[in-house]
């Protein structure tokens, strides 16, 4: 509407200006007209609104001259009206549906025009899109030419190889019969030369083998590609607080079009990346570190020290009122290793067992560092459930000691889990004199010690029945030990078996090493001084085995950061977090069943967490979460690539809706060559894009948002523009760490990389001769 008004005013003002200049010329620029507005090439020009002042003052004296200027005045108005008429859009038909493709104004309303955010598509002007299509067609033509030429080259190469082997056989036969030494040496040289050629056959090269027929296409493609790589492109970015979902089959370009462009600087806040195969780390970690972010790689299977370590047990605030809730949440996630919507009897009781073991081991580490020297990890919890070594106690409750090589040591017993509980049910978790709890201080950026004694324990659990008679024993641990021991042996055995199954993966020594302590914590992602880029890396071979620990991470992340939405000042909420965090969950379904996490999608956006889910197809989601899942419903923006399955195509077709089209039908009447034809027009409905058309999208994608028309636009390919290519730098050799803790493997790897860089620098060093004097 605004641009139409501007067009009309431009025509009207132009007419008024021409009338003003014509009137001034007819009056020979008399002084009565006043001073001109400006001069151009010694010619006076008057502002168009001066005409109306002259009309008021002079029309009564020279009406005839004014009449001669009406042609321009009314002509401008007429042209403006005609322009409005011809620019009027044809009314859109809506009787059977009003679906239509979105345009630039719709993109602006969808908040996809942003300087930063998640890259969702490419929206170039018509000329650049035309050039890109030419490049893609030229690439197909080049590939076809190269393929045929390579096939012909391979056939010729096979013939050459056959002739070469035949010649080699003849040389060997000749060598066996020739007696002359010189001739034999010459034949031997020929044989060696031929063997080298046969051992290293030539490969097809378009410039060498098809210079006239194929190489022009290769050269033209490279030249046009270089030209387009220098051009600036318009990328659509989503920087809202709403979630996104991508449905794109494997090898469809979602990595090069969405993930990598987003990580190469488009998203400037914190990000957590589910990085299968470590591709995203290798391509984008270097640039994100250059952005000033903390770049962390958590790879549970890493054996070289390049990965940061994370111990979920260190997330529990020991000696504080929230310790039970944190331990219960952690244990529930661990027990629910299959991602069920609700745990059954055995799973719920297994969570209880894991809870009490976690709390006991942490307190025991502080209370009895001699027998529990290291802070517990998931490996220690799993091992504790298997069997234990505990001090041997005599009838009076005192440790039994013996002399070994002249040294007095305590005797120990190897016991099963239930036997261990019986001997530990009266364990003093907060002995006389208290304990010193080690915790991380963000202000000091170091570990500090906090004293905790029996009075602090009583303050946290004032209503516990056992606290009066057993002031040094943790009441919750004691009560749960008694509850477990009171269960029938068969039931207790099944519960412990369920707990062992849930924790079996953590007995892997490599996984145990990488979860033994924490180089970072989940709070750092949103509250560290600088934004953090965290890559959760796992090789495809270990995907199913390690899915539970990544599910654990994401669910703990949500539970930790979704406790309080913020504090209110002057009636407005002020966020508690320092940085927003993007959950970039590539191959979301590979993480297994995350029903509890999926249920949080409806509210976690308000806590600064934005989820970017990427799946291969709708059947993949339905197989895990059921057909009535609400995952896609909670994602405001949905991006559809050409799918491989029918369900995704039908889903997108129904989501986009129908348009109304006008069809013309022809009816013939009469006969004997005198027939007449009647034409009738009617309206009918048609899908704006059908399922089979969606499967043929090719280099295009669909962007669908609730409340807005769908956008049909081009895919991004980061390697086709220098804007992204210039950001490709080497990834760090080792992960950054926030909490400095001893890690010999990491330190050794750093020294090794430094030594390798020195050797490379020495090789590249250029020595110059500088004459003396």
Give the ranges of each region predicted by the language model.
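Alpha-helical transmembrane segments and their helix-start/interface "positive-inside/aromatic belt" motifs
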Residues: 1-12
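Conserved ATP-driven motor cores of ASCE-family P-loop NTPases powering translocation/secretion/packaging/pilus
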Residues: 601-603, 607-702, 765
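Transmembrane alpha-helices and immediately adjacent membrane-cytoplasm interface residues
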Residues: 56-92
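Charged, low-complexity interaction regions
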Residues: 173-186, 202
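Active-site-adjacent beta-strand anchor residues
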Residues: 9, 274, 642
